[in-house]
């Protein structure tokens, strides 16, 4: 009996017809051999997930081929490169056992059970063997094995970790597992997708080695994790490796120490200490945000840090978030440090009565928050246990929702523009599996966000399943100078807390109505933002944020009186200025000021003191001589007052 024709639909709605159910690779080959050679995977029926080229397609399947030119194709390359790395290591050291090797951001890793410790000294040997495997252009093919065959095979190879994984799949009802072969002898348990042959790997590099535990549990076997990366061409790899080296120089922990801004102590894990200089940066950000809050109708509130746990039972945090909270018992009552401000703002809202005319109510709060992070997960300022957010909650009517979203996005744009952070993307994160609230509420909340963005002509991407447990959200993903994404701002629609706390307002009809609640932040955690921003700017913060904005450098003690006059005048204009009167050479003082990233250096010698002029040197190395005191004062104070990203002289020099 002949099979009826199978129609495959391409992205432009053209079709390919087959007399059998084709694979995705066959679809690529039907278009052209060159395309087939460059194809690494396929997206089916509008899914964002990449499927293997060996996937057999049903009639009317919509297929979008993923080629080497597609940005996401590198995920398939890295997945296959992880197998090649594991194969190379087992070729060199057969006694090493394999566990798992997933793709991660910017690369991949593989965890190994090894009788000896891997070091970076082993990398050259491993990379050489990987290159041999790539040069052989071994075909990669998939076989689906019955569960029992897979268990027996891996048991015979003494691969106990693979056996455990397969047995877990059997408990979940799986009857077969995918096995991928590199050539004919080496194979691994895997779902895919994978490239067609090892020769499609064009550029890779082993990066580092670290300890790990099987399945992330310290009670399990200790493993060794080898990190690596791969790209579709060598140029992309070289750029990435350059950025890695640059990231080491820009590491905020290194910069924070060099600039004397913050430090950590083991007696307060995950809790940064901000020095006077660091606190200046911190407070500068808060002051700027407070000014914007006043301008845009927010009221800043102060709420307690510790609450009876019943508050978090009401809010749902106890049921959904308690593993990330700190608890204590006082006078036989259970208390918890607040991990978020939203429940306390609901209490504050309920302390008053509102009519429809009073809404929106906008509460901003710089209160300290505490969230538990595992010791191994903490990282400088970007993963801490105590922090402050530029947190605010908006209580509004449903008919005000789109307007409030627009106002928030306008405010966010102003802040990001002021900070030189124009490169960002918006993601709409939808309902997760672990959530509270009815499906009707989720439909309403997700729809409101999407429609508001569309009405503002703001492009966005869907991030399915990544919403908060209480509602969908917009995640603002900032891309820094090294092309790394950071989730900073957020806007979350919450229909659940107003219901949980029975929040009400009196409508125009004199009946009680439920307000809509928006959770919003622009920078997110200030601690985390400062870490990210230090790395983005390489420590060259805008002049208005810098702890020391001006350094006065004397050439000789004879001009000290004039220097002190300048210092006092600048202080009178609220400029943070230091006078370096040390008996050191001028070049040494300049170098010291540059290392501290000080935006303005005023240099005074005999000639300047006599003519009451100065030489102004900027941290970019440019120098402007013969400026009058008034000119320098106006320049510096204007730059700081307007919160300029850099000196106006630096801008004009760049423009010209």
From Swiss-Prot:
EC number(s) on file: 6.1.1.3
SMART domains reported in the protein's UniProt record: tRNA_SAD
Keywords carried by this UniProt record: Aminoacyl-tRNA synthetase, ATP-binding, Cytoplasm, Ligase, Metal-binding, Nucleotide-binding, Protein biosynthesis, RNA-binding, tRNA-binding, Zinc
Gene Ontology CC entries for this record: cytoplasm
GO terms, molecular function: ATP binding; metal ion binding; threonine-tRNA ligase activity; tRNA binding
Gene3D superfamilies referenced in this protein's UniProt entry, alphabetically: 3.10.20.30, 3.30.54.20, Anticodon-binding domain, Bira Bifunctional Protein, Domain 2, Threonyl-trna Synthetase, Chain A, domain 2
Cofactor note: Binds 1 zinc ion per subunit.
One record GO biological process: threonyl-tRNA aminoacylation
Cofactor: Zn(2+)
InterPro entries: aa-tRNA-synt_IIb (IPR002314), aa-tRNA-synth_II (IPR006195), aa-tRNA-synth_II/BPL/LPL (IPR045864), Anticodon-bd (IPR004154), Anticodon-bd_dom_sf (IPR036621), Beta-grasp_dom_sf (IPR012675), TGS (IPR004095), TGS-like (IPR012676)
Every TGS domain range: 2-67
Span list, region Catalytic: 251-542
Compartment annotation: Cytoplasm
Pfam families named in the record: HGTP_anticodon (PF03129), TGS (PF02824), tRNA-synt_2b (PF00587), tRNA_SAD (PF07973)
Catalytic activity: tRNA(Thr) + L-threonine + ATP = L-threonyl-tRNA(Thr) + AMP + diphosphate + H(+)
Binding site for Zn(2+): 342, 393, 519
Subunit structure as annotated in this protein's UniProt entry: Homodimer.
Family the entry assigns: Belongs to the class-II aminoacyl-tRNA synthetase family.
Function of the protein: Catalyzes the attachment of threonine to tRNA(Thr) in a two-step reaction: L-threonine is first activated by ATP to form Thr-AMP and then transferred to the acceptor end of tRNA(Thr). Also edits incorrectly charged L-seryl-tRNA(Thr).
Protein's UniProt name: Threonine--tRNA ligase
Organism (species): Bdellovibrio bacteriovorus (strain ATCC 15356 / DSM 50701 / NCIMB 9529 / HD100)
């Amino acid at each position: 009996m002949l099979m009826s024709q199978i129609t495959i639909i391409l992205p432009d709605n053209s079709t390919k017809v087959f007399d059998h159910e084709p694979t995705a690779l066959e679809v690529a080959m039907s278009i052209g051999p060159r395309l087939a050679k460059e194809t690494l995977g396929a997206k089916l029926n509008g899914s964002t997930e990449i499927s293997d080229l060996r996937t057999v397609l049903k009639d009317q399947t919509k297929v979008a081929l993923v080629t080497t030119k597609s940005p996401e194709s590198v995920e398939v390359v890295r997945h296959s490169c992880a197998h090649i790395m594991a194969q190379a290591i087992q070729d060199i050291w057969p006694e090493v056992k394999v566990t798992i090797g997933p793709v991660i951001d910017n690369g991949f890793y593989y965890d190994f059970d090894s009788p000896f410790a891997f070091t970076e000294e082993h990398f050259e040997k491993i990379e050489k063997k990987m290159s041999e495997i790539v040069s052989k252009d071994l075909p990669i093919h998939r076989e689906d094995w019955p569960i029992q065959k897979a268990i027996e095979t891996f048991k015979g190879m003494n691969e106990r970790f693979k056996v455990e994984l397969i047995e877990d799949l059997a408990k979940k009802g799986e009857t077969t597992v995918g096995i991928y072969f590199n050539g004919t002898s080496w194979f691994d348990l895997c779902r895919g997708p994978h490239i067609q042959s090892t020769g499609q790997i064009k550029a890779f590099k082993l990066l580092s080695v670290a300890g790990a535990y099987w399945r992330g549990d310290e009670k399990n076997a200790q493993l060794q994790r080898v990190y690596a990366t791969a790209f579709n061409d060598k140029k992309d790899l070289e750029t990435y490796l350059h950025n890695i080296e640059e990231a080491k120089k820009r590491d905020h922990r290194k910069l924070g120490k060099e600039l004397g801004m913050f430090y950590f102590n083991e007696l307060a894990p995950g809790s940064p200490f901000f020095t006077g200089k660091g606190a200046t940066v911190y407070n500068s950000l808060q002051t700027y945000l407070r000014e914007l809050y006043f301008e845009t109708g927010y009221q800043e509130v102060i709420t307690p840090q510790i609450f009876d746990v019943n508050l978090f039972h009401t809010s749902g945090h106890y049921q959904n978030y308690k593993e990330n909270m700190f608890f204590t018992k006082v006078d036989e009552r259970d208390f918890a440090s607040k991990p978020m401000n939203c429940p306390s703002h609901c209490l504050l809202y309920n302390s008053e009565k509102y009519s429809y005319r009073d809404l929106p109510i906008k509460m901003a709060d710089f209160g300290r928050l505490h969230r538990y992070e595992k010791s191994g997960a903490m990282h400088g300022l970007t993963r801490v246990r105590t922090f402050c957010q530029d947190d605010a909650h908006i209580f509004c009517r449903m008919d005000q929702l789109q307007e409030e979203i627009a106002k928030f996005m306008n405010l966010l744009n102003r802040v990001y523009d002021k900070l030189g952070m124009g490169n960002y993307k918006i993601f709409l994160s939808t309902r997760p599996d672990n959530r509270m609230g009815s499906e009707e509420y989720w439909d309403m909340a997700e729809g409101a966000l999407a429609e508001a963005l569309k009405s503002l002509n703001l492009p966005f991407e869907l991030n399915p399943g990544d919403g908060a447990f209480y509602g969908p959200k917009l995640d603002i993903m900032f891309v820094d100078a090294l092309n790394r994404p950071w989730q900073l701002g957020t806007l979350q629609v919450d229909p659940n807390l107003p219901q949980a706390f029975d929040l009400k307002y009196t409508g125009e009809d004199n009946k009680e109505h439920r307000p809509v609640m928006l959770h919003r932040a622009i920078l997110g955690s200030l601690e985390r933002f400062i870490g990210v921003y230090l790395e983005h700017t390489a420590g060259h913060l805008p002049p208005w944020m810098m702890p020391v904005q001006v350094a006065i450098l004397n050439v000789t003690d004879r001009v000290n009186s004039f220097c002190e006059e300048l210092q006092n005048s600048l202080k009178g204009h609220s400029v943070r200025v230091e006078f370096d009167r040390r008996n050191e050479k001028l070049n040494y003082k300049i170098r010291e000021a540059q290392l501290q990233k000080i935006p303005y250096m005023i240099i005074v010698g005999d000639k300047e003191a006599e003519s009451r002029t100065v030489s102004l040197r900027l941290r970019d190395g440019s120098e402007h001589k013969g400026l009058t005191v008034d000119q320098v004062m106006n320049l510096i104070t204007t730059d700081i007052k307007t919160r300029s990203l850099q000196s106006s002289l630096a801008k004009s020099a760049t423009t010209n």
